[in-house]
């Protein structure tokens, strides 16, 4: 599980185009970033997540293990992973096209009553890693945040 978390953390998604539909959740005002709360219904099915994400563009959903969504302005992507023997929702990755990690960290800490701590051993010049544990949706989760000069990627995962 940690290998999957690390691999997803180092991957960023970029895209071109898109529409400017103002009804899509997680949309940004140009020059700002908006925290997006993904589906945290751990163990749920792909159909449940698809219903939750109905306002987003499904970029990839061709298998039973992952769904990838983008908001209309391509400033936020959300990847859902369905791992384990039951293929229930077990990991969520949200990537923001922004350099404003402090805002995202603050929102996570405030919403989920947790502290994200800088991981000096994993951080390098231009790349900073934060981690923490908390409870979301009644489940203990691990949170890993990877910040570069252009993106902030947050990985939420259940440890079991």
Set out the residue ranges of the language-model regions:
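Short Gly/Thr-rich strand-loop-strand
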Residues: 110-134
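Short helix/turn-capping signatures at newly exposed starts of structured segments
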Residues: 16-117, 156-160
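C-terminal motif of bacterial Sec signal peptides marking the signal peptidase cleavage site
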Residues: 11-15
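Short, low-complexity, Pro/Ser/Thr/Gly-rich segments in the mature regions of secreted, periplasmic
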Residues: 146-160
């Amino acid at each position: 599980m940690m290998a999957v978390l690390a691999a997803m953390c180092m991957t960023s998604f970029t895209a071109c185009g898109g529409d400017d539909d103002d009804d899509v959740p997680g949309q940004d005002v140009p020059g700002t970033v908006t925290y997006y709360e993904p589906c945290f219904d751990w163990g749920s099915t792909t159909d449940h997540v698809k219903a939750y994400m109905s306002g987003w563009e499904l970029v990839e959903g061709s298998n039973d293990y992952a769904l990838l969504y983008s908001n209309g302005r391509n400033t936020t992507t959300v990847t859902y992973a369905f791992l384990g023997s039951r293929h229930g929702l077990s990991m969520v990755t949200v990537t923001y096209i922004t350099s404003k990690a402090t805002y995202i960290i603050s929102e996570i800490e405030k919403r989920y009553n947790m502290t994200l701590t800088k991981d000096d051993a994993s951080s390098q010049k231009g790349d900073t890693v934060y981690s923490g544990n908390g409870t979301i949706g009644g489940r203990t989760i691990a949170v890993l945040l990877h910040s570069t000069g252009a993106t902030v990627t947050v990985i939420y995962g259940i440890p079991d």
